Amino acid sequence: MTQYYYLVASLPLLLFGDPPPFGSRAWLDACREQVAESDHALLARISFAALTPRPGDHELWRAYASWETALRDELAVQRAQKLGLGPDPFLREAPFYVGLAAVAKEALNAGTPKAVEMALDRRRWSRLEELETGTQFGLGRLIAYRLKLLLLERNYRFRPEAGIGAFTEEYARVMENAAAWTRAAAPPSAME
């Protein structure tokens, strides 16, 4: 099993709730020179959007993807129950994990949609910490780091100041366009 002592030792500590120290794309680019090609291909393939580990993929990725799928299934069951729907069309095959129903229920009762997402991401983070125990300097540690970095990037997009800044820029652009359209539509005599 390949060990990545220098790379793992050089990675900044990731803490839940902190901004990401760099983007996951930049991190993958930096890893390209230091990890085996097959390991880099796996790291690049890992995402929350596609929980599709392949046979032969690292055990940590397979274990996490399995747990995440079970969590999503439990969320689908509880949301469907609230809406009076059957959950079957939303479920994917996943093993049973003790306590996952309580995790989903607690998160769904967190309040606002942002609070729900933060509660779920905090639990995802905890699961990754459980799985990475004992991985030391191997690929498992890099997989957990990749997933944590993706979580930090996702949470960073929820920042109110980023939303306010984007809104302010878009509003200014709309107002500029409206003023230009008003001037363009005004009859020539109104401009004199």
Question: What do the PLM-derived regions correspond to, one by one?
Answer:
Residues M1-E192:
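Extended alpha-helical surfaces
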